[in-house]
Amino acid sequence: MSQNVLVVHGGGPTAVINASLYGVIEEAKRNPEVGKVYGAIGGTGAIFSETFIDLTSFNDEKLKLLLHTPASAIGSSRYPLYEKDYEKMVDIFKKHDIKYVLLNGGNGTMDACGHIYEVCKDQDIKVVGIPKTIDNDIAMTDHSPGYGSAARFIAASTQEVGEDVKSLPIHVCIMEAMGRNAGWITAASALARRKQGDAPHLIYLPERNFNEDEFLEDVAALQKKQGGVVVLVSEGLHDENGESIVPPIFKSERAVYYGDVSSHLANLVVKKLGIKARSEKPGLCGRASVALQSSVDREEARQA
């Protein structure tokens, strides 16, 4: 009997999640006991609709394109799972002779992976989690695939914006980085600094409480000294009470969709300090950029 593999993507994609997918197919082809490698089309919900694609049916030339393709080639989701759902999965896995279930995602996906493992451990079905998140906040990992490319993007973007602001030093530019409650991406902007005075000039992380008055004082002092100022802020900034400095747009099961922190702070600078300011929010560009994909990140994702 063939032992098939099922790969499921969960949560937000990255610039290298497809490299992990390629790595799975590559390794499966080396093992004669493995039959097909299925991809769940559209994430976790595809398990219940049994919407699978046979990834081993593609030739090597096409599969290698995955290494340099952004986002998720098989689709992802934030499909909510409940206790009753996990038992249903076992029957579906058996129906398709799936002996290996590989879930590629962040914290929410790893949580689901644990639940699926519990219902499969006595059914001779192996469940494995493949780490993925630009936020770099998965427990017990030094760093996760996806973060390196996002870090490279924000560092390169900060360096370029810094040169722009330096050449016309008349305003404050506030750049907002993704990462939710983790400041790893925002902190990576410091890699743009090559010499004293280079951007970013100020960095604000969600690991510390944010004080608007102190922020305005910092900006005013630097702007008076050097003219142009580049500030990096995290989308997850919060005050001393733990409240987001900008109310979230909305919340779903596990995810919080933050408001425009950079726009809010730029408006504060204009209104309170009378200084020209603008906001930049790369957003999804920062996790989808293949142009700035890290080769190290890609190889680590492939091996993950």
Feature annotation, model-predicted:
Residues 4-14, 72-76, 99-104, 172-177, ...:
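Short glycine-rich or small-residue beta-strand-to-loop segments that form or flank ligand, phosphate
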Residues 269-304:
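C-terminal active-site/capping subdomain that shapes the small-molecule cofactor and substrate pocket
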